[in-house]
UniProtKB/Swiss-Prot annotation:
This is Large ribosomal subunit protein uL1. It comes from Aquifex pyrophilus. GO terms for biological process: regulation of translation. Pfam families: Ribosomal_L1. One of its GO terms (molecular function) is tRNA binding. GO terms for cellular component: ribonucleoprotein complex; ribosome. It comes from the Bacteria. Belongs to the universal ribosomal protein uL1 family.
Amino acid sequence: ILGPRGLMPSPKTGTVTKNVEQAIKDAKRGRVEFKVDKAGNIHMPVGKVSFDKAKLLDNIYAAIDAVVRAKPPGAKGQYVKNIALSLTMSPSVKIDINETLRKLQERAA
């Protein structure tokens, strides 16, 4: 019952570990796992409605950077094709991918 729903602890998801101290540090730093569905869509939280604009932007750029850095070496072509943000159970808002990636590069420089 719990396994298919993703509720069982698992080494793959990082919920079972031999290094408890590191797991606690990661959790306190705000480590977020992202999941990919069968269509290749990535689902991950980037903040809460209560966050201010600057904090949300920082989180969005950090999330996109994490996805770009996770690109497998053998993957060819454009890795991120579009970005859409939404609240839980609300319509999404499309984000300009080219401008977002450009700003991400500017922030890294």
